[in-house]
Amino acid sequence: MTMAEASSPAGDTAAGTTQSLMRVRGLQKHFGEHAVLRGIDLDIMPGDRIAILGASGSGKSTLLRCLNFMERPSAGVVELAGQAIVRAAPGKADPDRRTYDEAELTRVRQRIGMVFQQFNLFPHMTALGNVMEGLRTVRGQREAEARTRARAELARVGLADKAEAYPARLSGGQKQRVAIARALAMDPEVLLFDEPTSALDPELVGEVLRVIRSLAEEGRTMLLVTHEIGFAYHVANRVLFIAEGVIHEQGTPDQVLKNPTQPRTRAFVDRHREFDF
């Protein structure tokens, strides 16, 4: 595989379709003079389970945050279900300035769920209240309807008995499962996981990975930034290795994790040989 092939969008899909759910072309993100993303091209197909690997500072988390516009891309095109989200409007003083329709971004974020490293639960709300919040304030659902849906999502992640518990009374793994339930309640078309186990004690990692695995088995479309290489091998249908803000190599788990073609990918994988592929 050449570097050009390594950086091109993969044609293999989970659903066997050529219609992208999300399409990314030339995505860049700059913080001042520092380029974090330097031209990402990516097609996300329905049912894709994409694991994103790379060293710290490579741009993995920034990519996810640009995909749901928590960070505004500096350049490039992002499409969701064939509709462009990015609105380029070069300004006279700053030709790289980009403007966005805030109402449109709010609608987009409802369709792209995100689960963070640090849970981000409201401490003054119960687990049930945290899951209900988006349904009430964003979706405008009535309390009874939101409560029913929130309880169902908590049950899905194995926390039906913790509905009335406050975050301070939950373990890290339980907090992360509440965060996953909160994302699922909004019926996202794509789920983004930003190192969801990195803040957990080792003994709590498994309970979160089991939930993510079950979502993958349901056919959920997801992107997962993770250092759990063995988990990525068994759950993902595609693996991206990002280095210095570009997709350095991509392919199936066997291609990238067992038979990488790029020296940098190979060095990264060799550091994780203790994992059972």
What are these model-derived regions, one by one?
Residues 250-251:
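ABC ATPase "signature
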Residues 191-194:
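Catalytic Walker B motif of ABC-type/P-loop ATPase nucleotide-binding domains
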Residues 165-168, 186, 218:
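Conserved signature/switch motifs of ABC ATPase nucleotide-binding domains
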Residues 125-133:
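Short coil-to-helix segment of the ABC ATPase nucleotide-binding domain corresponding to the Q-loop/switch region
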Residues 68:
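Helix-to-loop junction immediately C-terminal to a conserved catalytic motif
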Residues 76-93:
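Conserved ABC transporter NBD signature motif
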